[in-house]
């Protein structure tokens, strides 16, 4: 897309046969145990108002398997049909759209990946809920997902909250009784004349009876502009998220999430350091966590950084190491911005996407330092040649029989979906499959039960199995 890119809860069940949040699970690690590798079948569906535009599918789909059927849900801009949620049957011999549900008539970029909260019945969607945000700043609770007709009869979208200012551009995530999301204001600062974006905690489960049917909300201010694609992660009793200006924030979950004064946020924020002389710039990546550490990437000015922070016993993160997204092969240097969330394969390897405009980029393997604080980046090549397509999404990784497979799509005028395979101790990959060239594909893939799904700006939705 030409505009730049969730979670175990106390009230939801997350299963291996689901991709219910950004990154597939509460840790946002995008690691799956089953994925299409060879002899694939590709189906390209056309959603509402297809074949043109720059603001079609800009989010990552949600997926779940109910009984023996795998479904995908995708939030997208239907142009004249407005902000729309679609349900797709991926398991049919020829995948098809089950229903479309318009949330709002207003058209525009829909950049917030929704959240699927699954109920206790694995054989029905009747007790499942989707939380989705529109580009107008409204958050919807969507029920009746079991509907089976194209007009979505029985699907109800209830507006539960509207932000006062800005766009909701982050994934919606959930921990405990709460959902979390952030807003972005293009020119705001915490002590300036224009207020910046905010991060919100909305209580959607175990709501106290004194709330008069409303959902209790707390929020904190960003220091600079706001939050763009920066999805939150929770570890222990704290919630962590990143924003523009190169800041990492940490707040207590629950009653203490908000601040008395906006400027109190300084006490629980960290200004990210430069890495090898390269300033952080904005952070437009969701945080991934593994083994008590936080991993994320910064966009940078022209070159991004990957960061690793260790969570202390008091929940306060401390800088562990960083890597600048630049490497040299022969006489050629490869580098770029980053909005991709780093992923750690079961092999232990760290992979991340990068881009430079809409015509260059690729994938890098990140190696943590054995001593010191400076990691290294290595370009993933394909059969000895540089792969130089822009990758703004978060790759999905699958490790099988000693091989790392990663799945991603490219945000270029000929954008497509790819599967690469590489030995864990190598950086030269083999292309396993590729969809036909199409158009800008920003949001990344979701993979569930062996099905890979992604969309693009032309409202083309690809199902690979």
Sequence positions of predicted segments:
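C-terminal juxtamembrane segment of a hydrophobic transmembrane alpha-helix
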Residues: 8-12
């Amino acid at each position: 897309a030409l505009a730049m890119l969730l979670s175990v809860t106390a009230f939801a069940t997350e299963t291996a046969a689901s991709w219910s949040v950004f990154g597939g699970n509460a840790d946002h690690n995008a690691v799956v145990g089953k994925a299409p590798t060879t002899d694939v079948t590709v189906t390209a569906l056309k959603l509402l108002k297809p074949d043109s535009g720059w603001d079609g599918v800009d989010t990552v789909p949600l997926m779940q398997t109910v009984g023996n059927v795998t479904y995908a849900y995708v939030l997208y801009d239907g142009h004249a049909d407005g902000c729309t949620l679609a349900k797709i049957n991926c398991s049919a011999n020829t995948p098809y759209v089950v229903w479309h549900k318009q949330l709002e008539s207003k058209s525009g970029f829909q950049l917030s990946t929704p959240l699927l909260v699954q109920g206790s019945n694995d054989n029905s969607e009747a007790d499942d809920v989707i939380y989705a945000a529109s580009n107008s700043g409204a958050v919807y609770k969507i029920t009746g997902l079991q509907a089976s007709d194209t007009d979505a009869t029985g699907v109800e979208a209830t507006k539960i909250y509207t932000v006062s200012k800005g766009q909701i551009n982050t994934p919606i995530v959930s921990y405990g009784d709460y959902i979390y999301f952030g807003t972005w204001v293009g020119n705001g600062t915490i002590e300036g004349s224009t207020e910046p974006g905010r991060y919100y905690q909305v209580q959607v489960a175990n709501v106290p009876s004194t709330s008069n049917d409303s959902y209790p909300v707390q929020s904190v201010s960003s220091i600079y502009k706001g939050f763009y694609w920066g999805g939150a992660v929770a570890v222990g009793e704290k919630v962590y998220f990143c924003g523009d200006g190169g800041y990492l924030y940490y707040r207590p979950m629950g009653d203490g999430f908000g601040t008395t004064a906006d400027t109190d946020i300084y006490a629980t924020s960290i200004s990210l350091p430069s890495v090898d002389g390269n300033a952080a710039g904005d952070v437009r990546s969701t945080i991934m966590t593994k083994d008590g550490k936080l991993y994320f990437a910064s966009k940078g000015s022209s070159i991004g950084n990957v960061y690793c922070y260790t969570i202390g016993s008091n929940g306060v993160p401390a800088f562990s190491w960083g890597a600048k997204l630049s490497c040299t092969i022969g006489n050629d240097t490869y580098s770029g911005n980053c909005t991709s969330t780093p992923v750690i394969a079961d092999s232990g390897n760290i992979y991340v996407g990068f881009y430079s405009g809409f015509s260059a980029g690729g994938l890098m393997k990140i190696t943590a330092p054995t001593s010191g604080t400076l990691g290294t980046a290595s370009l993933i090549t394909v059969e000895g040649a540089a792969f130089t397509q822009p990758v703004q999404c978060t790759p999905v990784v699958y490790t099988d029989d000693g091989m790392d497979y990663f799945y991603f799509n490219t945000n270029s005028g000929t954008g497509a979906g790819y599967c690469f395979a590489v030995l864990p101790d190598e950086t030269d990959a083999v292309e396993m499959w590729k969809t036909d060239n199409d158009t800008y594909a920003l949001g990344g893939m979701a993979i569930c039960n062996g099905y890979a799904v992604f969309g693009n700006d032309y409202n083309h939705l690809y199902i690979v199995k």
